[in-house]
Amino acid sequence: YTLTAEIHYPTYFHRRGMVAAAREGDKENPEWRSDGSQFYIVWGKTYGGGMMERIRQRVKNSTNPPIELALEHEDTYWEVGGTPHLDGQYTIFGEVIDGLQTIDEIQLAETDENDRPLYDFRIIKAYILKE
């Protein structure tokens, strides 16, 4: 099953530790509907200097309608890291606020040909925090 996209960009963006709903590609899913059961935790890398300008152009040229990356996020991508090329295209619904070292370990797990871990990882405890 799928869910209506709830993209609240630039409020929520793909900095390291954010949790977002996976989805099918744009051709199969032009409404960007989110998968009801699959998600990803953003890791990415840090970006600096001219790299952000190249990513900004790439995103603008590859999205329809064109998405303009927010300049105010550049320091976060420089210091914390993330995946700016995904901004404005996926539903972000959570954030890892403790345990990023565990996420670092998960990303090193052995995977199959579809980049899925050979063994399942389970979230044992999650909390809903109000802003």
Question: How would you describe each model-predicted region?
Answer:
Residues 1-131:
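Cross-family detector of peptidyl-prolyl cis-trans isomerase
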